[in-house]
Swiss-Prot record:
Pfam families: PCRF, RF-1. GO terms for cellular component: cytoplasm. Keywords: Cytoplasm, Methylation, Protein biosynthesis. It comes from the Bacteria. This is Peptide chain release factor 1. The keyword NAD does not apply. One of its GO terms (molecular function) is translation release factor activity, codon specific. It is found in: Cytoplasm. The lineage of its organism: Bacteria, Bacillati, Bacillota, Clostridia, Lachnospirales. Belongs to the prokaryotic/mitochondrial release factor family. Methylated by PrmC. Methylation increases the termination efficiency of RF1. NCBIfam families: prfA (TIGR00019), PRK00591.1 (NF001859).
Length: 358
């Protein structure tokens, strides 16, 4: 690990020198690429420098204890030695995490798809609440949310909704939200006070770019039509809505949120590219998970990831056994504590896998 860290420091210094050269500064694309690489390496370099400082402090403290007879100086050296050893242990853990292979999609924007599951109208209402939860969370982070398509019910529910979240590292954070979310509560129409269980599914997909997915024109059918609102009512007098059909996969994309046919077509193709890219990612991840299962006997993914219990004001994430009693705050977008815990658990699992493979 330490040989690799020394190589990274050397490379980091080379990057800093390159970024100061006029030729590089005048080449916008190259400058941007090198700046990104430099900013990715900076946390590793800074942590490793602190680690080396602490190691040096340990050596200095041991030397004082070996040579110094003054009791006050020896006590100070013992305290410094204790603190430095604790810091070295923490910094070594941090370095191992920083050196974990990075998901190449982590920096991408995301497209989120929420679909109401079991539970009828109550499931649609829950899907709408989960949608608003993510919108609030994204807005609190200064991210931009753009609705791509929504199938709304007449009383505020959503049978389905697809939206894009644009922001730095959006996929690295929101990818942990994929899975089935479950709600337990008494519906307003329930006269006996019985608790009903409903579900909605959440799929978080990294936005695919043209370079990620190539779509052949002959594989696509494009239909244009007038946009419609709830109950099929016409909301546009021009053929602005667009429907794409991808023959090889059977995927159908419908976009009508924009007034312009061109904009709806762009949104539809963006969503299609992302879904095709996600299919490829899922195939790869399933193959890797199967390989992991054969190696260490783990890797199964539970379908139900989280329960929102209204009578108890409780939210439980079943993947990490985390329970929080702040349901209202969470539904208002306060999900950072859950996400941080998921990230920590994921990092711990990856470290364990690396140590096992080694």
């Amino acid at each position: 690990m330490f040989d690799k860290l020394e190589d990274l420091i050397h490379h980091y210094e080379e990057l800093m020198n390159l970024l100061s050269e006029p030729d590089v500064a005048n080449d916008a694309n190259r400058f941007k690429k090198l700046m990104k690489e430099q900013s990715d390496l900076a946390p590793i370099v800074e942590t490793y420098k602190k680690y080396k400082e602490c190691k040096q402090n340990i050596e200095d403290s041991l030397a004082i204890l070996d040579e110094e007879s003054d009791e006050e100086m020896r006590e100070l050296a013992k305290e410094e030695l204790k603190d430095s050893k604790e810091q070295v242990e923490e910094l070594e853990k941090k370095l191992k995490i920083l050196l974990l292979p990075k998901d190449p999609n982590d920096d991408k924007n995301v497209i989120v798809e929420i679909r109401a599951g079991a539970g009828g109208e109550e499931a649609a209402l829950f899907a709408a609440e989960i949608y608003r939860m993510y919108v609030h969370y994204a807005e609190n982070r200064g991210w931009k949310v753009e609705t791509l398509d929504a199938d709304e019910t007449g009383i505020g529910g959503m049978k389905s909704v697809e939206f894009m979240v644009k922001g730095s590292g959006a996929y690295s954070i929101l990818k942990y939200e994929s899975g089935v979310h479950r709600v337990q509560r008494v519906p307003e129409t329930e006269s006996q006070g019985r608790i009903q269980t409903s579900t909605c599914s959440v799929a978080v997909m990294p936005e695919a770019e043209d370079v990620d997915v190539k779509i052949d024109d002959k594989d696509i059918r494009i239909d244009v039509m007038r946009a419609s609102g709830n109950g099929g009512q016409c909301v546009n007098t021009t053929d602005s809505a667009v429907r794409l059909t991808h023959y090889p996969t059977g995927i159908v994309i419908y976009s009508q949120t924009e007034k312009s046919q061109i904009q709806n077509k762009e949104k539809a193709f963006a969503l299609l590219r992302t879904k095709l890219y996600d299919m490829e990612l899922q195939k790869k991840q399933d193959a890797e998970a199967e390989e992991r299962r054969s190696q260490i006997g783990t890797g199964d993914r539970a379908e139900k990831i989280r329960t929102y219990n209204f009578p108890q004001g409780r939210v439980t994430d079943h993947r990490i056994n985390l329970t929080l009693y702040k349901l209202d705050k969470i539904l208002n977008g306060d999900i950072q504590e859950i996400i941080d815990a998921c990230i920590a658990a994921d990092q711990a699992k990856k470290l364990s896998n690396m140590e096992h493979d080694a």
